[in-house]
């Protein structure tokens, strides 16, 4: 997937982190796209003859769906040519869009076409009638506005601030230090995180810490995996390897070798 330079509309900027696109014209191809924990849910619109399947569940996905937090290693499996656009959301955004317990979205996808209080099919029809990325993003943006207006979930500034602090610190911040910055008790923080993100603060911090380490793996500024582990805040190499494997199903060295052989 490649990130696309795109100016997000001002009213949706608090909800959208970035936009990704990808396409493959090989009708005989077989593509598997690993999805690792990164702390961000998103909306995907996909076009393919044979469908997208979520592995290991082997679940056929809707043409227009919202995916939640990724905790276990999962992947998208696609046979033939395909094209998709992803609106990557901030961690709390799925709560504002769907008004449901975000925990039910963990390691899963929500079929937006099943919504019965908005005519989502109208948006899907508009999406399939254009190949222009700008137009597709505009259509999905209009759908997001309709969902936000419908649910009218109260914004939680303190949780949004806590998320921002955790991300800025690459997950390397103690919960007590975080509480001091947002003036909240640990119990209240955990309850609000579960309500708005579907994760505990510690789970979310661990995911951001892992994502920081996987980004460092692709850089050439480190001499060893041990250096990456320490710089990412892991207590020792075994801690780093254990955490990395829990999110990817692979050791860091295997992941790196596989990456270089692509």
What is each PLM-predicted segment?
Residues 1-160, 166-170, 175-176, 182-186, ...:
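Alpha-helical bundle regulatory/interaction domains
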Residues 98, 241-244:
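Short, function-defining helix-loop hinge/capping sites that tune catalysis or transport
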Residues 192-201, 234, 244-251:
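HTH DNA-binding helix-turn interface
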Residues 216-219, 243-262:
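…primarily DNA-binding HTH/wHTH and HhH modules…
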